Amino acid sequence: MSSEYGALRSLDSPNVGSYKLSKVALNGLTRLMASAVDNNQIKVNSADPGWVHTDMGGPSAPRSPEQAAEGIVWLATLPDNGPGGKFFYDKKVIDW
């Protein structure tokens, strides 16, 4: 699981710096792994579930766990010709 904070554009602000850097590293690892398994019927992608109403996200978070899970399950069940090495939010590719 990644986050919008894993996008390089998020580094313009120092807020939650260590969290952002961990997500940037995760996104980098996603790209490396996707390249390593290319053409092996393995899909490696990164997903941002959004701000989710969980213990970590808190009661103000607008998304339910079920809403967040939709995109994650979709990625986990991509067909063989589905995308790999991408960053997704709500089943849409977003910029790294």
Pin down the residues of each PLM region.
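C-terminal helical subdomain
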Residues: 39, 46-49, 54, 58-96
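Structural signature of the Rossmann-like NAD(P)-dependent dehydrogenase/reductase core
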Residues: 1-3, 43-48
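Catalytic loop of short-chain dehydrogenase/reductase
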Residues: 1-39
